[in-house]
Amino acid sequence: MREYRFDVKRCFTPENVVRLLFVCGCILRIWYAVVTPVTMRGHDIWELSVNAKGKAAYLLRLVEWGKLPDSYELQFYQQPFYYLLSALAAAVMRGLTGIEDAAFLVNAGKVVSCIASCFCLYLSERLLREFCPVRVRGYGMAVLSFTPVFWLTGGRLGEDALTFFFMAAVILGTVEWEKQSDWKHTIWLAVLYGCGMMTKISLAFPAFYTAYIFWKNRKSSRFIPKMAVFAVIALPLGLWYSVRNFVLFGQPLGYVPSMGEILYRGDRSYVARFLSLDIRNWLRSPYANPFQDYNFPVYLLKSELFGEFTYDMPVFIPTLLLLFSTLLTLCVAGIGIYKIYRWKSAPGEKRPLIWGLLFGGYAAISYWKLPYGCSMDFRYYMMLTVCKVLVLCCFLDEEPEGHFAQEQLLLQKGLKGLCFLFTGFSILFFVML
């Protein structure tokens, strides 16, 4: 009988490690979505009734009445694509089980968020594959698989996870269009933008980067017809609901409901809100507070991990998790600033830096236009983590050279260690929920 010997090196190759991390990330997202009721750590769910005006009512009206909202009050202003998909999932579950309870139907709608979150992880890995060799992709996948904001949004009713999916999809689609600008890629990218804007109008923001890539390739064959077809597909798909509400109810284009004085932060200076790092707030608590906090950088650091919620667990776990995440983010930000300063001579891929500036600018503009505590929530800006991971992995792939080769090598080792610590404490945080 042939003796079987387990070969660790052959089993845990870099490719297999990336696959394992992807599977673990998906399992974590699915598990969280299954065990967490829709009313826990949700946003704007409100009553589980067709007579309410929250996200649950939006879904239930589609399932039970088969029609879109008849006003733009409160959460009914939201774009419909996520709720149409969630209503379809809830209707299928009702047909399979015969259960018509409102809580069951709303919980069933979370399936779309969970699936979108898993596909987001896949698209993020695809972006890593575009720019980084497999030997460093495992560090990025560890961060992406276990960063709490991803599985938190994947386990709740709302358009955040699906919005992130389309954000990643249009960026990846633009990268692929740049390599092959044929009709298939043009039409596919237009559909992604249209469905993305039908999920959240903010999907129009990455179009600035896509337009830049289009303009760079304007000498390619049949450029004008392709752009015309792109617009004919993307704009009607993305804007029909806004036009419908404008015509039927007079809803202003780009409308966002008032969030109330209790969340208003516009009375603080721009320096306090944007241009400083509030260390005192960072030290006070690992959790963000939308009713008190106003410092944008610190709020992003906290809400990337914990959203707008607090958790019943030993405080050292979220505190150390925040510490490791902050160190990782600050190091990557420093690397990015150096590469921007040495733009022409700095080695490595520049596109993740451009995306980081784009999405960072979008986040800052959003908080500037809507100076409310909840406008800083990281669930709106999850592409920033993907950009951070891309810059990180590109740096880890660089061969140290020059006068500071030893320092660069030491920094690379330190960042790898931070990835391990961050991953370990993210898993511990999940286990302690």
Please name every model-derived segment.
Residues E130-V134, V170-W188, G196, W215:
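Membrane-interface transmembrane helices that cradle and orient dolichyl/undecaprenyl
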Residues G25-L28, G140-S145, L172, Y193, ...:
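Short helix- or helix-capping micro-motifs
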Residues I30-G42, W46-Y77, F81, A89-T97, ...:
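Extracytosolic helix-loop segments that constitute the early lumenal/periplasmic catalytic or substrate-binding loops
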Residues P225-V332:
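Membrane-lumen/periplasm interface segments of specific transmembrane helices
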Residues F104-I115, P286-A363, V386:
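Membrane-interface anchor segments at the N-terminal boundary of transmembrane helices
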Residues V149-T163:
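Short acidic/glycine- and proline-prone juxtamembrane loop motifs at membrane-interface regions
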Residues Y4, G173-K179, P206-L235:
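Perimembrane helix-loop-helix junctions
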Residues L96-F104, S124-F146, F164-F165:
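Transmembrane-helix signature of polytopic, membrane-embedded enzymes
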